[in-house]
Amino acid sequence: MDRRDFLKTVAITGAALTIQRSEAMEVLTQTINKANGSNPDLVAVMGGEPEEMFRRAISELGGMKQFVKPGQKVVVKPNIGWDKVPELAGNTNPKLIEEIVRQCFAAGAKEVVVFDHTCDDWQKCYKNSGIEAAAKKAGAKVMPAHLESYYKPIDLPKGKKMKKAKVHEAILDCDVWINVPILKNHGGANLTISMKNHMGIVWDRGFFHQNDLQQCIADICTLQKKAVLNVVDAYRIMKTNGPRGRSASDVVLAKGLFISPDIVAVDTAAAKFFNQVREMPLDTVGHLANGEALKIGTMNIDKLNVKRIKMSVSYTHLRA
């Protein structure tokens, strides 16, 4: 379905759900403490467009210059796995990617690269997601990831099930990288967020599914070159039939965004948010606890310094 047909379908069926009750912000932050005077560990934003929510969130963390230094080579790694238009929430929102790339250059980045190891045909995914055009508009280079020759072997000495992997050369060759997943349902992992987005930097994804998916997701996150920042796109959420989705009825317009250097914390906050769209207890998303056990982050967001932001007075009600 192309974008024109999708919009016609939504107009007729009202399938893309939206909400208008302020309880959504309480759900977003019901277990999160207020930030104190220092830069927060995690920022949760609701009620704006993807790019404006990111601008507000990154400013709360001290600006992009806290994470990207002049002259650095930067990778921005979205989820571009599926041949889907943005309205179907299969991939990271292109407006968010464009803004992040722009801010990387504003912070002095020498080069910004965008890529993902897609599931559908990579050229169709890059085009129809809108991410290729958005990234290039902001000045980024868009790299393919469909050939094994793009990947180099690394060791994962801290991994339990996965002890080695082939990782895309863009990650290995950059100075810093920013992880930008979309929050959505996943048939195997139950949720795909920042940690699972690492499967898009490796060549052999089949290994994950054959050797304890939830543990392997945590294992790949032990790689030495960790993302300096994790930005979770929760503007639209695929609540069912993920990761690919079937129709607009799978999508909820939530207008949320989570951002943190702590990958386990940001995924825990996003998972709590998703749980208000569709019941998804944290213990069913096993890679979160596995990641905490490997000491790559914390699930105990109650002890973190968290900033919560409302950007408007009207929200989407998330209780299905």
Predicted regions and their residues:
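N-terminal and secondary-structure boundary signal
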Residues: 1-318
